[in-house]
Regions:
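Positively charged n-region of N-terminal signal peptides that target proteins for export
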Residues: 1-4
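Hydrophobic "anchor" residues
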Residues: 69, 80-81
Length: 87
């Protein structure tokens, strides 16, 4: 019984870790336009391989100005980084 409880607890924590990020609670009317945001990132040296809009975030997969692979979640209203993974 203890083993089952442990497995269920681990699955619950694992599920929470993979939940979508909340980047903003602002309505989409206040978000930057995707094309304008992409241009801004490219002007900062990012090369965008994939651009997504999961939930309330803008997310990119690509490389930064140093050429390192990145996965970054941005607040689509002001462009701040919410989460960044650099390989």
């Amino acid at each position: 019984m203890k083993r089952l409880a442990l497995v269920l607890a681990l699955l619950t924590v694992s599920g929470l870790a993979h939940a979508k990020k909340t980047c903003t609670d602002q309505p989409k009317e206040k978000w930057m336009k995707e094309e304008d945001f992409k241009k801004r990132l490219e002007s900062e040296g990012y090369k965008i391989r994939k651009f997504k809009q999961p939930g309330s975030c803008y997310e990119i997969y690509g490389t930064n100005k140093e050429g390192k692979k990145v996965e970054i979640y941005f607040n689509p209203v002001d462009g701040t980084v919410v989460k960044e993974v650099v390989e």
